Amino acid sequence: MRIKICGITQPDQGQAIAQLGATALGFICVPQSPRYVTPDQIQGVITQLSISVDRIGVFANASLSQIEQVVQQTELTGVQLHGDESPQLCSEIKQRFNHLELIKAFRVKNLEALAQITAYFDRVDTLLLDAYHPQLLGGTGHTLNWDNLAHFNPPLPWFLAGGLTPDNIQEALTRLHPTGIDLSSGVERSPGDKDLTKVAQLLTQLQQFSSKKFP
């Protein structure tokens, strides 16, 4: 299972989280976000990494040129679109950056919103399902209605996000079967300041879950 910790801002925390067992780090490239980091800050984290992990830049309603500017200045391995990007724009971004993983995030408000995801199946590499919030794009601490996802079985890999914590991760994975999980506020002291104790607790919970599932 992929384990993505999003909203990394500090090099020492990025390195520690990778060492604890995360498989991906997310960097927020949305200037309005309290977790925003510049390309220089992103690269500052990446150069400190001694372990190979996926490095994902998170954008929301950014132009192709804005994404390109960040990609050219950093060693990202993937781009995540967390806004209202159309299937057509996703195709253009994938074509332009075909060497990078393209993740499309969806803030799922209801079953109707879930149905709209099908239009993206052949446009992106990976899906991410997050909780809906009328003002915030992510890191809300709100959980999804997991019941709505009971029959979600897309042909692509997908991350479950939205209010996940060390305390509820086992329940989430008992009820749903994502190929990855994405946490931000659930392992933070404050926006952008990760709580390494909580990250360690998360990995412990995942190990316990795995041993129960595959004794």
Swiss-Prot record:
CDD domains: PRAI. InterPro entries: Aldolase_TIM, PRAI_dom, RibuloseP-bd_barrel, TrpF_fam. It comes from the Bacteria. GO terms for biological process: L-tryptophan biosynthetic process. GO terms for molecular function: phosphoribosylanthranilate isomerase activity. The keyword Isomerase applies. Pathway: Amino-acid biosynthesis; L-tryptophan biosynthesis; L-tryptophan from chorismate: step 3/5. It catalyses: N-(5-phospho-beta-D-ribosyl)anthranilate = 1-(2-carboxyphenylamino)-1-deoxy-D-ribulose 5-phosphate. Its EC number is 5.3.1.24. Keywords: Amino-acid biosynthesis, Aromatic amino acid biosynthesis, Isomerase, Tryptophan biosynthesis. Belongs to the TrpF family. PANTHER family: N-(5'-PHOSPHORIBOSYL)ANTHRANILATE ISOMERASE. NCBIfam families: PRK01222.1-4. This is N-(5'-phosphoribosyl)anthranilate isomerase. It comes from Rippkaea orientalis (strain PCC 8801 / RF-1) (Cyanothece sp. (strain PCC 8801)).
